[in-house]
Amino acid sequence: MLTIENVNQFYGQSHILWDLSLEVREGTCGCLLGRNGVGKTTLLKCITGMLPIKEGQIKLNGRDISKISTEARARAGIGYVPQGREIFPQLTVEENLKISLGARDDKITRVPDHIYELFPVLLDMRHRRGGDLSGGQQQQLAIGRALVLDPKVLLLDEPTEGIQPNIVRDIGNVIRKLNKELGLTVLLVEQKLPFARKVADDFFIMEKGHTQASGAIAELSDDLVQKYLSV
């Protein structure tokens, strides 16, 4: 379970997150929704430790992780796929995946088989350079690299952005499998409502750095969409 309690965060003098609280239930997918600039990516970076919080707590299965380092949070079970994927273009697919092995406590030296089972294209292309992959394949690589950590919580920042429809479908299927079969908790930022409705169990709508509405994804009404998400 991932719990955010009364988190405040600033960029200089700008107050970005205001007493923000939410809870992602264990083994479910929660979706952060909101217009651009409301603090969704900032929240994910706060959870990873890339950005410090001024006040509040971030808890993983009841443990406060808000004061430990980014590396320690990764070891504790926080996996993260940022916008832009940030793979290493000169490294092979397999080398990109192996980068995450160093953060595992069991010190294994090979990519776990289930990563290739989730993303068969990565097995077929494991000796190709990351920069030679399509955008969709790079997104699969980025998710696979995060999963090599064997995380308890996976954070995804707009995983469908700029991705071809068939791979969007595959990514959605993987998220549901991670939830339902492997019990992984997922928190994703998403702009595409059809995708959010397909993969998410719960939603959290953000506006001005605060959670304005939340609930089961089936409760995401047209009125809420019009009020908080329409451009």
Where are the predicted features?
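The feature captures the beta-strand-to-loop junction immediately N-terminal to the Walker
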Residues: 33-35
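Helix-to-loop junction immediately C-terminal to a conserved catalytic motif
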Residues: 48
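ABC ATPase NBD coupling module
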Residues: 52, 64-85, 108, 112, ...
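Conserved ABC ATPase signature
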Residues: 129-133
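ABC ATPase C-loop
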Residues: 146-147
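Catalytic Walker B motif of ABC-type/P-loop ATPase nucleotide-binding domains
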Residues: 154-158
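Helical segment within the ABC ATPase nucleotide-binding domain
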Residues: 169-183
